[in-house]
Amino acid sequence: MPRCVSVRLYWASCETAIVKRYGLTTMAPLPYWRLSGFYLFYFALLGATAPFLALYFHHLGFSSARIGELVAIPMLMRCVAPNLWGWLGDYTGKRLLIVRLGALCTLLGFSLIFISKSYAWLALVMALHAFFWHAVLPQFEVITFAHLREQPERYSQVRLWGSVGFILTVIILGRLFEWLSLDIYPVALVVVMAGIVLCSLWVPNAQPSSQGRKAIEGGFLKQLLSPGVPAFYITVALMQMSHGPYYTFITLHLEDLGYSRGVIGLLWALGVVAEVLMFLAMRRILLRFSLRRVLMASFVLAALRWLLLGSFAEYLWVLLLAQLMHAATFGSFHASAMSFVQRSFGPGQQGQGQALYATLAGVGGAAGALYAGYSWNTLGPTITFSMASLAALAAAVIIATRLQEDRA
């Protein structure tokens, strides 16, 4: 037997043994660790950007308004790129190729940051790398659900490794930036992006199947206009808009309140630990409660979280409580949202459904980053986070009145 074949068989047997050891036997032949490894590195990149990108731009001397604009640019690209790549993925069926090319072009595009640190050049780098970065995840989500087939509720058991990658990154970089200058920040991002490229080469392909699923008739537009679907997508944008001040300025806000970068990294990690625990519980939650109830609870807790962060973040116990609420504002929201998208579109429209989710999340995130950038210095953190709270409450009202009560 050739050595390369024997090595592959060895790792396959190890993968199966580990999956069985942790009670995941029903997911075989799911390539659990290969999918999980990709999520780990993909969200490690988010863990490197969400807490520290604004801090890096502040280190370069940009104003709050400019920081808000630079952070919003990747989110604006999220409004454009996923729809193009989603249509291409559904049309060609070559989703894994799109994932691999997107990961490689993300790395190459971001590497241009080493040429200049001017505002115009950084804006170009943010737009270029984000155009390809946002091509990756929606297509990979379709591949993951294709591997899961009739067990979509187990998505969270794979996705939780993305949260692990986020946690490791924020802790490591938080400590690192206490000892070293933020000038090394772009190098750290390039290393993580290289990991995404390598993991994309390790993942096997899979295509969505309609077998065992209730037939969903009509094209993408007809499915999109089904009862409750437009309302759901509106709430996606509102939820991400409510996160705008958090993702853009919470690190700077906590620094101004006297927290060290190491502690800030741990606080970010705490939120994602809560998210991981929620992912582990989501299968049981979605089997017991309707998507409508889970989404409503997520939005209401998000509204409360932003009020706490905007008004009482100087109290550590309040800050700890607010970070634990990340379990709802991202964990339960994202898992239930993915379940909603997966059940609402047929196999031939899954890529477009995921792309629209990413697009509207980008619209909301960009709007949130922009208004936070312009209001932070003029209105202050309390008013800025209060506006975020209102957006989350609006999403709760829409879900309560427009989404039907049924089980995931």
Go through each PLM region and give its residues.
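Hydrophobic core of transmembrane alpha-helices in multi-pass small-molecule transporters
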Residues: 40, 109, 119-136, 237, ...
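Interfacial helix-cap and linker-helix signal at transmembrane-aqueous boundaries
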Residues: 57-58, 88-89, 160, 175-180, ...
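Loop-to-transmembrane helix entry/capping segments in MFS-fold secondary transporters
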Residues: 64-65, 149-161, 261, 345-357
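Structural signature of the two symmetry-related core transmembrane helices
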Residues: 97-111, 293-308
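Cytoplasmic helix-loop-helix junction between adjacent transmembrane helices
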Residues: 127-161
